[in-house]
Structures are given as structure tokens and as C-alpha cells.
């Protein structure tokens, strides 16, 4: 109550910010007359003037009014578009590192030009991030005219580009690209063997378009670069025969033994998207696997020799019970292609991890591709948090404002619309069955069609969109289908969706990023005519003019019919996705309407609110085809959505907490790797490693401060001979001197190791040997890092079970991840020392050839795949999902106290007495700083 009272007096935080920015807009508007008088050359010259002022120490904040005024005037001249005042406010929100929520059609692409121009003046690069290559290329080509006019260079970073093209794109003042490609480039830059092979500069400022899609929807999905691992193709095929032989149990057994409606072999938890074998299911699976010869007669699935089979059993079960064709994936050209559950788009090249994809391939009887080993990985959460400044824009962020602030430290500011919205959002209609719901949808579409009103129908899956398309064909209603299967025709379909009598079916937000203009998008159609080389120039001009004349008539006709009507055939589990669908109507003050049609069979209602609503319908004795339309029901659905959103937020937050463990490690390992690349001579590092390993080996057989009776000299001599080809007569030294100490033996071994090392260096020269050492070190770090990632992945699979032992899974994961990491560091030191000490050298040329072979083996991996693997979709338990990113992200640690500005941004200097970033609690110098 107090908060509401204070808001009435002082206004909300959002209102105060907008008011504050409005004052700056007044300052910018006052400069407009003066800027308008400048010639094109003088306007372009302002960029050089601004750059000099920034170089002289003037802040970008102080420069903002002039820079925004110049950018607005340049846009008016080049693009024939002048930024509205509310767009200037949006530009300021982005410059100050916040999220701007702007309604559909308010010109987000144009808004971005203001902060992008201002921040590009500093010369440190600006990244504009979009959700797909089409939007990146469209926006870059569209806005490049403005930036080039102002003297700034623009690069486009697309998947499949050549290395040189990528370097040029990143060297430009402004770089457009997709979130996936920016993330993969960061990972690839940390796998190179030469400094000039990197493409990215330090991560300075990013403007993320559709920020909710990238930072919220895809936050659970790490970017993974992987290579082929061991082949289990035959096992997936044989295991595929198991799920059809098992029956689902209906109901959950309670403590008193009741609750099971129908006994079975496995239970499904749709809410958590998990599948579990029951006791009888285990017995049946074991019996069948024994019959097929996969396990011994009478053996348990949990026997040590069979434990890996459990992975295949559950992968096959999840593939058959939780993942459905044309909903979660499609089969295209003999391959299983994932459908993004948030956008409905096909995710070509992306694969589920943990063997799930292979299990689905076996289920669909297509060629099974080999399992992969993770080479490098990062989550979007941790990638985008590395930027010095981050901003974003979207049409729907306010429902997730808390998460943006909590996870990324980004405040959300709702930007006022340029014209007041006129869209009418009607109450949901809820039917008993899906058939009744679709009958009502068809009636509504027919009514709109007869009145000449365009309709956009949103569905939650490809399967539903094709079902509705079939029903519309039966009803004789012409329509277009816009889903992942028609991706290529997407732009053309969206361009026409606002014409009279046009019916368009879209999965979720397919076509997002393109406005639906009432009367049809004449500009888009004009562009198609312009691009057709077969049409003569005068004919093009005539047709384009005719298009614009027709559009005026159609535009007024559609407005009179009520504008675009949105029909939702199901509620998504996120209110934000529903709001995005609604937001397609009523752009820039146009009329429009929306309504959702639901049935009690919908997953959201069935899981969260079905029983309550069904009892209301039964009590009211509602006849078939009659709908409930009441605020109380709509509110209960929104309450269910809030529960799901809260649960998903908890999953993402938990995932981040696990991922932070490995993220610190990744930063340090990548920092160390970059230092190795840039160092001309790593002798000191190699010497420190050798001394550490030699000391450890000697101490195993001759402990510090021990007496002769405790020594095992013969074993020490054998270890030195086998490991490093050091033939030392230590027993003779002991026999000759009765007073020899453990320290003297260590010194003798150390001296011999140093002499052998120096002899190798002398044969080929310091520079050649140092280059060889660097290659060995990089290849060893990369190989053991990959093995470490696999170990962490294995660790995350079962860490949630520690909760049953009254232990905190996060703390246990942190502790064991550190132990694994420490073991990896020891292995790196031992492996590098072993290779360097054992290498047989005849000539510098031979050494150079060996270094090249090492780099080739490490740097040119065959069958490398770039995955955006959703662990949550793989049906892992919630706690397990959360660990997923941590496991994939721990690409992290060889430690070094040196500082380096690497390709992925400024790496913080770790002081010798600072806590070690690995989380052990020790000082850096006593932990991973030892390596350097």
C-alpha cells in the first residue's frame, strides 16, 4: 500500500527514467535546426570530430546529444526516416546498458543505430546481435547505408564464412551477426594455435535484438563444439527395440500403496519431462537385455560392467516417450532435425546431447551418426556477461524484468509508443475438447474472412499448424502456413499476411523480426520486383507505383474491417510468448484484436488447472461446443503460467550457479592459453613444471626429511629411466656416501634433468625448441581439457543424487570439479614434461616437423560439429539440467598470474595473494598459480 501511495506521488521508476531521458531529447531537438544546415560532407565530418574528442578524453555520455542529433539527420537524408522522440529515448536506454521494451512496429532496428553510432566512435567495436542470419544480413545491409554515410565501416558475421572474411567483419566499426556465431567464434578463438588465427577483438559493447529470446529462452542451451567419440551405433539400434515392449504406468504409488491406476514398467513426469523405470520395469528390461545377449543371465543393470547400458536404456525411453515427430523434431532428407520449441524454426546442425539424438535417429530408422566429445563450450549467460557493456531490445521483456536484473544486471525500461495502441484483447474461450476448440477457431476465421479482415493464427507446434491447415482446407478457407518447414518462404508469406481476407498460420513466433503491415507490405513486394532482373526498368517503376496505389486502398479497407486479428490456438507456458503473438497486431496505433481459444486437453491446462476448470464446467452442465469465458479462468491460467515461469527461472538460475564454477576455470585456462600463444619463450614455465614433476617423483621414493631405511632407490632409478630416459646411478651415490640426504638426492636428479634438457636445447637452438614446447603444451592442454569436460559431464549426470545423502549437490559439484581440475593440472605438467624429456632430436628441421604434426593433430579436428544442445530438452532432472552448463562450461583453468587482453575481452589479473578463481579457497600462488 505504501509503495502504491509513493508511486502516485513520485511516479514509478520507469516513469522517472523516461522523464529524465525526455529532458535530453529536448536538448537533441534544440540542435536539430543547426545540424540540418550542414552539408553532407560537413555532417560526415562530424564523425571525425567526435572521434578526436573521444580520443582526447571526452566521455560518450557528454557526446550523446550531438551524436544522436547527427545520426537522426543522417538517417533522414539517407534512409528517409527520422527518429521519433520515443525512439531517441529507446536509444538512450540502450546506450546506458539497459533493456528497451518497445512494441512491435515501433522501429527497433532504427533505434539501435543511435547507440551503435555513438559507441562505435570509441573505435573498440560494437556488436549487433540478432537471432538468425536472415535478420543479421537484412539489418546490416539496410543500416550500412547510414553508417557508411557517416564514415563508419560495417561487417556481417555469418555462419560458414571464410576465416579472412570473419577477421574483416570483426575489424569493422560495427559487426552484425547471430548470437550463435559470436559465441562459436569466441570458442574457436580459444582453440587456435597461432595468434593471427583469431578473429574477435575484445568484447566491448553488444546490442542484442530480441533479447528475451537470446538471454532467456536460450539461456539453458550451451554452445558446444564437439568432435566424434566412440561409436555405439549398433547398441542404439538394438536398444530401440526395448521401449515398445514396456508399458506406461498410470498414476504414482503413494506411501500407503494406493495411487496406481494401471501398473506398468515406467512412469512419465510431463511437468519435469522425466521418465523413470519402475521395479517391474527394471526386471523386465534386465530379462530382455539378457535374452538379447547384452547382459549376462541374472545380472543387474546396475552391475559395474553394465552401468553404461543404463544411459542407452534411458536415452531410448526418452526418445520414444518424451520426444515426438513434428513437434520436437522433423525428419528431413534422412536426418532428424530439431525444432526450436520457442520459435518453431528448424535448428539444422544442432544435436541433442547425451546420446538422445542417436536414440531418436534409431527410433525413426534413419542413419545414426556417431556420438560426440565436447571440445569447448560456453553458455550465452556467461558469454554475454563478458561484454564491457550489454544492452538489449525486444517487444516483450517486462514479464522477465526480474530475471534480466538478477542474472545480467540489466534494468528493463518500457518505452512509450509513438501512437496510443488500439488493439482489443478479448477474453480467452475455454472448451472441453480440442475438437470443440478447433470448431470455434474455424468459425472465427470464417467470420473474419467474410468481412475481409486478415487473420494470423498462432500454434505451438508444427503438428498443430498442419492439423489446423487440414481443417481449413476441409472448410474451404484459403490460407498460408508459416512454420519451420516453410522457412525459405517466410519473408514472402509475412509480407502478404496483412492483406484483406488473408489467413496465415504460424508456429509460435516464426516470422519474428518482420512487421505485418495492414494491406500488405508494399515495400517488401516492391523489393521483389526490384530484384527481378527480367523486368525492364520502366516496367519496374510502373509496377511499383501501381503497388503503392493499391496498398493505400487495401490499407484503409483492412483498417475498416478491424485490422489484423490474432487467434491463439493454445496458451504457451510463458506469458511472454503469448504477448509476442498478440503484439503482431495493433502496430503503430493501427486497430487490431486478439483472442485465445483453449481446451482442457492443452498441456498447460491439463497439468496445472484442468481439474478445477473441468469441475466448473461439469457443475454448470455446459452443453458440447459451449465455452467458458470468464476473468477468473483467465486469471487462473495466468497464475499457472507464472508458476511455470518461476520454475524455469529457478532452473536457469541454478544452471548459472553451477556454470559459474566452471566459468572461472574457463577464463583462467583460456587466459593461460592466450599467454602461451603470445609468448616468444616459455622456458621459465616449462622449467617450473619440470622441477615440480621431478620433485614429486623423487619424493614418492625418497620422502622429504626421511632416513635411508625409508628410501626405495631401485624403484626411483627405474622410474627415472622409464619416464624420462635418465640413467642415474643413485644407489652408487648412496653406497659411496653414508651421510647423503634426501635433499642431495633430489638436487642430483634435478641437475641431471636440467643438463639433459639443456643438451636438447643446444642441439637445435632456443627459439626452435621453445616453439616445439609451445606446440606440445597447447596440444596437451587442449586434449586433457577435452577429457576434463567429459569427466565433468559424467559428474553432473549424478550429482543431484547427493541430495539424498543430505549433502548440498552444488557444494559437492564445486568440490569434486575442483579435484578433477587439480588432477588435470597435474596431468598437464606430467605429460608435457614427459614429452619434452623423451623427444629424440637429430636436427632443427625434424623438431619443426614434429611441432607442425602436433598442431595439425590438435588444430584440425575431423567431423567437428557446432551444437546448441538443450540439456533440458534431453529430459534430464532439474538439478541435473542445472549442472549441465557447468559441466559443459568448465573449459577453464590452467592458471597464470600474468595478465592478457585476449580475444574474448579483458581477462582480469589474478594477484598472487588473491583467492584462486577455481573456488578452492586457497591463495592463487599456493593453488593454480603454481603452474606459471
From Swiss-Prot:
UniProt entry keywords in alphabetical sequence: ATP-binding, Cell inner membrane, Cell membrane, Cytoplasm, Membrane, Metal-binding, Nucleotide-binding, Protein transport, Translocase, Translocation, Transport, Zinc
GO MF, one annotated term: ATP binding
GO CC terms of this entry: cell envelope Sec protein transport complex; cytosol; plasma membrane
Localisation: Cell inner membrane; Cytoplasm
Residue pairs linked by disulfide bridges in the UniProt entry: none
Membrane spanning residue stretches: none
Positions with a binding annotation for Zn(2+): 916, 918, 927-928
EC number(s) stated in the UniProt entry for this protein: 7.4.2.8
Catalysis performed (reactions): ATP + H2O + cellular proteinSide 1 = ADP + phosphate + cellular proteinSide 2
Signal peptide: none
Membrane topology summary: Peripheral membrane protein
CDD domains per the UniProt record, alphabetical: DEXDc_SecA, SF2_C_secA
Subunit structure: Monomer and homodimer. Part of the essential Sec protein translocation apparatus which comprises SecA, SecYEG and auxiliary proteins SecDF-YajC and YidC.
Family indicated by similarity: Belongs to the SecA family.
Function: Part of the Sec protein translocase complex. Interacts with the SecYEG preprotein conducting channel. Has a central role in coupling the hydrolysis of ATP to the transfer of proteins into and across the cell membrane, serving both as a receptor for the preprotein-SecB complex and as an ATP-driven molecular motor driving the stepwise translocation of polypeptide chains across the membrane.
PANTHER family given in the database record: CHLOROPLAST PROTEIN-TRANSPORTING ATPASE, SECA INNER MEMBRANE COMPONENT OF SEC PROTEIN SECRETION SYSTEM
Protein name: Protein translocase subunit SecA
Gene that produces this protein: secA
Amino acid at each position: 500500500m505504501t509503495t502504491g501511495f509513493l508511486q502516485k506521488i513520485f511516479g514509478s521508476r520507469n516513469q522517472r527514467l523516461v522523464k529524465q531521458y525526455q529532458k535530453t531529447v529536448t536538448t537533441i531537438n534544440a540542435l536539430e535546426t543547426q545540424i540540418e544546415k550542414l552539408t553532407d560532407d560537413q555532417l560526415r565530418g562530424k564523425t571525425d570530430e567526435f572521434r578526436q574528442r573521444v580520443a582526447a578524453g571526452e566521455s560518450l555520455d557528454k557526446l550523446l546529444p550531438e551524436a544522436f542529433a547527427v545520426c537522426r539527420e543522417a538517417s533522414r537524408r539517407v534512409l528517409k526516416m527520422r527518429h521519433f522522440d520515443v525512439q531517441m529515448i529507446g536509444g538512450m536506454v540502450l546506450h546506458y546498458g539497459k533493456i528497451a521494451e518497445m512494441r512491435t512496429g515501433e522501429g527497433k532496428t532504427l533505434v539501435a543505430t543511435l547507440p551503435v553510432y555513438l559507441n562505435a566512435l570509441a573505435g573498440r567495436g560494437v556488436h549487433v546481435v540478432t537471432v538468425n542470419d536472415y535478420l543479421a544480413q537484412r539489418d546490416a545491409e539496410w543500416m550500412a547505408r547510414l553508417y557508411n554515410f557517416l564514415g563508419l565501416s560495417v561487417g556481417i558475421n555469418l555462419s560458414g564464412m571464410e576465416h579472412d572474411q570473419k577477421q574483416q567483419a570483426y575489424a569493422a566499426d560495427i559487426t552484425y551477426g547471430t548470437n550463435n556465431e559470436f559465441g562459436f567464434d569466441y570458442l574457436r578463438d580459444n582453440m587456435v594455435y597461432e595468434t593471427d588465427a583469431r578473429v574477435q577483438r575484445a568484447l566491448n559493447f553488444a546490442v542484442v535484438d530480441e533479447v528475451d529470446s537470446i538471454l532467456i529462452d536460450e539461456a539453458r542451451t550451451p554452445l558446444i563444439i564437439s568432435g566424434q567419440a566412440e561409436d555405439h551405433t549398433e547398441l542404439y539400434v538394438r536398444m530401440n527395440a526395448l521401449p515398445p515392449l514396456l508399458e506406461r504406468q498410470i498414476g504414482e504409488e503413494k506411501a500407503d500403496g494406493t495411487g496406481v491406476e494401471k501398473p506398468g514398467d515406467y512412469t512419465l513426469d510431463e511437468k519435469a519431462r522425466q521418465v523413470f523405470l519402475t521395479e517391474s520395469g527394471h526386471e523386465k528390461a534386465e530379462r530382455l537385455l539378457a535374452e538379447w545377449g547384452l547382459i549376462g543371465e541374472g545380472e543387474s543393470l546396475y552391475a559395474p560392467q553394465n552401468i553404461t547400458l543404463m544411459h542407452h536404456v534411458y536415452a531410448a525411453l526418452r526418445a520414444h516417450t518424451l520426444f515426438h515427430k513434428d513437434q520436437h523434431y522433423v525428419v528431413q532428407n534422412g536426418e532428424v532435425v530439431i525444432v526450436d520449441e520457442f520459435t518453431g524454426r528448424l535448428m539444422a546442425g544442432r544435436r541433442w546431447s547425451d546420446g538422445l539424438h542417436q536414440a531418436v535417429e534409431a527410433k525413426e530408422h534413419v542413419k545414426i551418426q556417431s556420438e560426440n566429445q565436447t571440445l569447448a563450450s560456453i553458455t550465452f549467460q556467461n558469454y554475454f556477461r563478458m561484454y564491457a557493456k550489454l544492452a538489449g531490445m525486444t517487444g516483450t521483456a517486462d514479464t522477465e524484468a526480474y530475471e534480466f536484473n538478477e542474472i545480467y544486471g540489466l534494468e528493463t525500461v518500457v518505452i512509450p509508443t509513438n501512437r496510443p495502441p488500439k488493439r482489443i484483447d478479448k477474453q480467452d474461450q475455454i472448451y472441453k475438447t480440442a475438437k470443440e476448440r478447433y470448431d470455434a477457431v474455424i468459425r472465427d476465421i470464417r467470420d473474419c474472412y467474410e468481412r475481409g479482415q486478415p487473420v494470423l493464427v498462432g500454434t505451438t507446434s508444427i503438428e498443430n499448424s498442419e492439423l489446423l491447415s487440414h481443417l481449413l482446407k476441409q472448410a474451404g478457407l484459403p490460407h498460408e502456413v508459416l512454420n519451420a518447414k516453410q522457412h525459405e518462404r517466410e519473408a514472402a508469406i509475412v509480407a502478404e499476411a496483412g492483406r484483406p481476407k488473408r489467413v496465415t498460420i504460424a508456429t509460435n513466433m516464426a516470422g519474428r523480426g518482420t512487421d505485418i503491415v495492414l494491406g500488405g507490405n508494399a515495400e517488401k513486394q516492391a523489393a521483389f520486383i526490384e530484384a527481378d532482373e527480367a523486368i525492364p526498368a520502366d516496367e519496374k517503376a510502373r509496377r511499383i507505383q501501381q503497388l503503392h496505389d493499391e496498398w493505400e486502398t487495401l490499407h484503409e479497407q483492412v483498417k475498416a474491417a478491424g485490422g489484423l486479428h490474432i487467434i491463439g490456438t493454445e496458451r504457451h507456458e510463458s506469458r511472454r510468448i503469448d504477448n509476442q503473438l498478440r503484439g503482431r497486431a495493433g502496430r503503430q496505433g493501427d486497430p487490431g484484436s486478439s483472442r485465445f481459444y483453449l481446451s482442457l486437453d492443452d498441456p498447460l491446462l491439463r497439468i496445472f488447472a484442468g481439474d478445477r476448470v473441468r469441475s466448473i464446467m461439469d457443475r454448470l452442465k455446459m452443453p458440447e461446443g459451449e465455452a467458458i469465458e470468464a476473468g477468473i479462468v483467465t486469471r487462473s491460467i495466468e497464475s499457472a503460467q507464472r508458476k511455470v515461469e518461476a520454475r524455469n527461472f529457478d532452473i536457469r538460475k541454478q544452471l548459472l550457479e553451477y556454470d559459474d564454477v566452471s566459468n572461472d576455470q574457463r577464463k583462467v585456462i583460456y587466459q593461460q592459453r592466450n599467454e602461451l600463444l603470445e609468448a616468444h619463450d616459455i622456458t621459465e614455465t616449462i622449467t617450473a613444471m619440470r622441477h615440480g614433476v621431478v620433485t614429486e617423483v623423487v619424493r614418492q621414493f625418497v620422502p622429504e626429511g626421511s632416513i635411508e631405511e625409508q628410501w626405495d632407490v631401485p624403484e626411483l632409478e627405474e622410474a627415472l629411466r622409464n619416464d624420462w630416459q635418465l640413467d642415474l646411478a643413485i644407489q652408487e651415490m648412496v653406497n659411496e656416501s653414508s651421510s647423503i640426504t634426501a635433499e642431495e638426492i633430489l638436487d642430483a636428479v634435478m641437475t641431471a634433468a636440467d643438463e639433459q634438457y639443456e643438451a636438447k636445447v643446444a642441439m637445435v637452438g632456443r627459439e626452435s625448441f621453445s616453439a616445439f614446447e609451445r606446440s606440445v603444451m597447447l596440444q596437451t592442454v587442449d586434449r586433457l581439457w577435452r577429457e576434463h569436460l567429459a569427466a565433468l559431464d559424467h559428474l553432473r549426470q549424478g550429482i543431484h543424487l547427493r541430495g539424498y545423502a543430505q549433502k548440498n549437490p552444488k557444494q559437492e559439484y564445486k568440490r569434486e570439479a575442483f579435484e578433477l581440475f587439480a588432477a588435470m593440472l597435474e596431468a598437464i605438467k606430467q605429460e608435457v614434461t614427459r614429452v619434452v624429456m623423451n623427444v629424440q632430436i637429430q636436427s632443427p628441421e625434424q623438431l619443426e616437423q614434429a611441432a607442425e604434426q602436433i598442431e595439425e593433430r590438435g588444430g584440425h579436428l575431423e567431423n567437428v560439429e557446432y551444437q546448441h544442445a538443450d540439456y533440458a530438452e534431453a529430459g534430464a532432472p532439474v538439478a541435473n539440467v542445472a549442472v549441465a552448463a557447468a559441466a559443459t562450461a568448465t573449459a577453464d583453468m590452467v592458471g597464470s598470474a600474468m595478465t592478457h587482453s585476449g580475444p574474448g575481452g579483458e581477462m582480469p589479473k589474478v594477484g598472487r595473494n588473491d583467492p584462486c578463481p577455481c573456488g578452492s579457497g586457497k591463495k592463487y600462488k599456493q593453488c593454480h598459480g603454481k603452474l606459471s
